[in-house]
Amino acid sequence: MALFKKKNYIRINPNRAHANDASKKPSVPDNMWAKCPSCKRTLYTKEMGAEKICPHCGYSFRIGAWERLAITVDEKSFHNWDSELVTKDPLNFPGYLEKIEKMQEKTGLDEAVLTGEATIEGQAVAIGIMDANFIMGSMGTIVGEKITRLFERATEKHLPVVIFTASGGARMQEGIFSLMQMAKISAALQRHNKAGLLYLTVLTDPTTGGVTASFAMDGDIILAEPQSLIGFAGRRVIEQTIRQELPDDFQKAEFLLEHGFVDQIVPRNLLRQRLSDLLRLHSLEGWR
């Protein structure tokens, strides 16, 4: 009878089908998309290139020290200095050394600054690059020691110094030992200056606190990346102190340029060439 005739269908286990669908679901790699803090557009990260610049508004995303090094100096010209220095915990601050280890694994750096010797379009230079990804680029004893030695070696070798700043200020976990670095670096910087050698600073986002109050603003020529946050105290602290509302662009690179604190704002994709031009202009070869 037709009633008992085998029907033309197959049985589907809904749980198994769901599991198969989940296994076939494409995985999206991390860091494929980013949102621009300036124009608020969602960007495909490959659009930004190695310089990590928004193609729509020109905003420069924060980049690490190794990324910065790769787009600034000549290939295979960098020689790392003082990577053997080890961070101590003078105040026995809870969890401090564990945090240092975690940051070292995350960034591939030994501390919040990378220092060494390299060439930029064939011109020898002592270079320091701070990394805000390493405890906000805060300045502790090792950061201070590495930058001090950078200036001392540059003075001995008669090299110009280029430093890319990116910092939240002094490292609170080291207390007064951190604050001491400001004076120590400034003394080495002054000896480099008395030797008649060039010092260029590039202020990047963010450059604040004790770094701003010491070597960041002491450059013979001070460059900055567009829209970088540059200042000493925080905006809220200043407003509460002076009891006035600050302009919207206060502590931005453009505001500082307008008020004479910065010599020039240079887009990241033009920085390498601008540094090369300045180094050549201030070298002996530049006067021949």
Swiss-Prot record:
Domain of life of the native organism: Bacteria
Annotated metabolic or biological route of this protein: Lipid metabolism; malonyl-CoA biosynthesis; malonyl-CoA from acetyl-CoA: step 1/1
Cofactor detail note: Binds 1 zinc ion per subunit.
Signal peptide range: none
One Gene Ontology molecular-function label: carboxyl- or carbamoyltransferase activity
Gene Ontology CC terms, in alphabetical order: acetyl-CoA carboxylase complex
Keyword Calcium: no
Entry's localization field: Cytoplasm
Reaction equation(s) it catalyzes: N(6)-carboxybiotinyl-L-lysyl-[protein] + acetyl-CoA = N(6)-biotinyl-L-lysyl-[protein] + malonyl-CoA
UniProt: Zn(2+) binding residues: 36, 39, 54, 57
Role according to the record: Component of the acetyl coenzyme A carboxylase (ACC) complex. Biotin carboxylase (BC) catalyzes the carboxylation of biotin on its carrier protein (BCCP) and then the CO(2) group is transferred by the transcarboxylase to acetyl-CoA to form malonyl-CoA.
UniProt xrefs under HAMAP family: AcetylCoA_CT_beta
Family recorded in the similarity comment: Belongs to the AccD/PCCB family.
Protein name as catalogued: Acetyl-coenzyme A carboxylase carboxyl transferase subunit beta
Gene label: accD
